[in-house]
Amino acid sequence: MYAVIKTGGKQYRVSAGQKLKVEQIPADVGAEVTLDQILMVGEGESVKIGAPFLAGATVKCTVVSHGRHDKVKIFKMRRRKHYQKRQGHRQNYTELRIDTIAA
């Protein structure tokens, strides 16, 4: 069984037992999180599609860890004008383990 969920403005295809890095969620490590924005659920040949979300469908996850992605370096430059700007960014994430999918 698999589901397409929406969290942090992005969509992910998940199945039970899978680990997934999503945008940071304010929850403690080891806490159970319930995601209710389910776009689609499929099992074998049967597929349920929401408009836009499936009513009553949930995905239960456990927070495994919190962390930060690798640094992304931004460099802006104007040729011949002696203008250079350097900037870095590290995005926070939460790693989830998908426990159950209920449709």
UniProtKB/Swiss-Prot annotation:
The lineage of its organism: Bacteria, Pseudomonadati, Pseudomonadota, Betaproteobacteria, Rhodocyclales. GO terms for cellular component: cytoplasm; ribonucleoprotein complex; ribosome. This is Large ribosomal subunit protein bL21. One of its GO terms (biological process) is translation. The keyword rRNA-binding applies. Belongs to the bacterial ribosomal protein bL21 family. Pfam families: Ribosomal_L21p (PF00829). Transmembrane segments: none annotated. It comes from Dechloromonas aromatica (strain RCB). It comes from the Bacteria.
